[in-house]
């Protein structure tokens, strides 16, 4: 049986409070999308990991749970505050998942942030880019999603991430971003099921989005 691991690393720093409600709704919609994929392709086992992070914590809301066992999140699960240890969160999350996956598995990593790295102590940029470049050779696909106050393309490139998406940090922009991501995730999953190769930098390439700003 094919196994697909969905890892979502979400910024929970203080500035995300502007879109707190929409971010929570978007995460729930993403969970629903993965569950729908599981229902559509029962012989392709879907796993979900969601980590949120700020300067006070790197917390797993879900830690490698089967999609069928995942339930919707509530307000208590997402409460923005603190600074942005982006490299630590990404490094910890992908290293932990790497320890339990094999080369036969597919891993889709989604990183969502509205701020730049500012307080990591365990992982440096060089460590992250080296780790990501290594994992990309073993059926790992990475996407980096950031707000329009950031140079999202440059941040993604610095980490060796080929897929990037910029969105406006307001209710409408956040909702549109998650809608785009869901379409792309569904397409990605169908391609895996069909045995199609996943092209470099192709995750967000669809009629719905070509790395457009929302």
Give the location of each predicted region:
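Acidic, low-complexity intrinsically disordered regions
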Residues: 1-214
């Amino acid at each position: 049986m094919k196994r697909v691991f969905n890892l979502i690393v979400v910024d929970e720093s203080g500035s995300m409070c502007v879109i707190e409600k929409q971010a929570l709704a978007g995460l729930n919609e993403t969970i629903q999308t993965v569950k729908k994929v599981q229902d559509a392709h029962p012989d392709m086992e879907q796993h979900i990991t969601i980590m949120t992070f700020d300067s006070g914590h790197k917390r797993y809301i879900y830690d490698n749970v089967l999609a069928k066992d995942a339930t919707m999140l509530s307000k208590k699960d997402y409460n923005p505050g603190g600074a942005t240890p982006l490299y630590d969160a990404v490094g910890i999350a992908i290293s932990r998942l790497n320890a339990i996956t094999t080369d036969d598995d597919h891993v889709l990593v989604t990183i969502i942030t509205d701020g730049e790295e500012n307080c990591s102590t365990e992982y440096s940029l060089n460590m992250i880019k080296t780790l990501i470049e290594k994992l990309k050779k073993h059926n790992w696909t990475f996407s980096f999603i950031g707000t329009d106050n950031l140079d999202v393309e440059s941040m993604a490139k610095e980490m060796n991430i080929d897929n990037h998406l910029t969105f406006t940090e307001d209710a409408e922009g956040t909702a549109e971003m998650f809608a785009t991501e869901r379409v792309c995730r569904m397409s990605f999953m169908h391609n895996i099921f069909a045995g199609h190769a996943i092209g470099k930098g192709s995750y967000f390439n669809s009629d719905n989005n070509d790395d457009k700003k929302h």
